[in-house]
Amino acid sequence: MEPAYFKWVLIPRARDHHHKRIREIQKRGYARVVFLVSSLPMWRFQHVYDRLAADSRFKLSVAIYPFPSFSLAEEEASMESLRSFFSEKAVPVLDLCGELQPGSVLRQLDPDILFYPQPYNHLYGNDLDSPHLADRLLCYIPYSIYMTNATWVYKSFFNNVAWRLYYGSQFSKAFASRVLFNKGRNIRVVGEPMADFFSEPSVHSIWKPQETVKKKVIWAPHFSIVDEGLHHRDSFTWLSETMWKMAVQYHDQIQFTFKPHPRLRSVLADLPGWGEEKTRKYYNQWERGDNTQLETGPYVDLFKESDAMIHDCGSFSVEYHFTGNPVMFTTHDMNKVVRDKNAVGKNGLLAHYVGRSEEDVRIFLDQVVLKGEDPMKQQREQFRKDYLIPPGGKTVAESIYMDIIQGLNF
């Protein structure tokens, strides 16, 4: 769409929708809020949900629907994990799976405020997409920390007509405001939502019990091992055997968690030299080992109780710094990894140890993890202070709640 069409048609129309919806809420005395969820690891709204639920002026609902990019197996696993998660929390769920017109079913809830999991125009490819629900107060909390200089995402319909975009830092707001057709007027800086999760104690230990005290190390490989583009990360191909050998070698000193990207399994199943059977056996050996385990769900408690991490994932290169623990990024070419990153992404990565070889990984385990020789500790702490501490001395959830209250004139 042309910038002029956004400026003179879509954005003014969105503001009219917002004003009308807010007047209806004020007249009614309460707001109906719906959280649309497609993946449990991307569910960053729990503290916001809990804070709104404590105020009787908000009537909350959760609706679940899979991303179209999921394979059938991924879809079934994702939806089942969401049903189980919300059932344990006694949160009623509107299950939109299998609906031919999920947007029409969602409209039966008549949401005033609608939180989306991603800000893309054609997220689902049906009437659940944001252009079909633009008469609502659309909100978005980024599911990951923006790390690149890419501008295309900000030019989407959603980002320009949404009522609120809740960003993590002034840096992110300033960058987006230069690109958005609405000049970022709908952006509010509240801090990274992960900060709320990391500030609370672990509910229960995720790590497998050991007979003796051991260091806890996470290995989190990305799935883009066959992508030859800018985001190609192939460290799994040269570390898969090495990491298992090290898990065996350090059996008495370290316990390892294999935390693969959710899509890695399906990629390996289709990869020559791997296939479904080899992939299944590989995952199973990590799950069943005495000092190893497989984790595919939420990772905050896993991070908080760990001592270090080895990975090549984008968002983890910032999020793991909430722990303050040493972390290694595995790549043969770190210059390529940081090339397209913004200040947040670049500085987060530069606060990592770099694993370019099996020997680098071994040195990291021996010197940093086991002996505690950690020369990058101060650099990590400075990064956390610069980018990860929420503003105003409030939790992220409280800042979002207060902004919604103010925006609705409650």
Place the predicted regions along the sequence by residue.
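Short loop/turn segments at strand-loop or loop-helix junctions that form parts
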Residues: A63-F67, P117-P119, P142-S144, E192, ...
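A nucleotide-sugar donor-handling region in carbohydrate enzymes
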Residues: E2-K20, P142, F157-D234
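Active-site and donor-binding regions of nucleotide-sugar-utilizing enzymes
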Residues: V34-F198
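Conserved catalytic-core segment of nucleotide-activated headgroup transferases in glycan assembly
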Residues: R44-A54, P193-K281, G355, L370, ...
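A donor-sugar binding/catalytic signature common to diverse glycosyltransferases
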Residues: Y140, E295-R339
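Short acidic-hydrophobic, aromatic-tinged amphipathic segments that line or gate anion-handling sites
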Residues: P92-E99, N291-T296, L349-F364
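C-terminal amphipathic helix plus adjacent low-complexity
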Residues: E358-F410
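Nucleotide-sugar donor-binding patch of glycosyltransferase catalytic domains
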Residues: E277, N325-G372
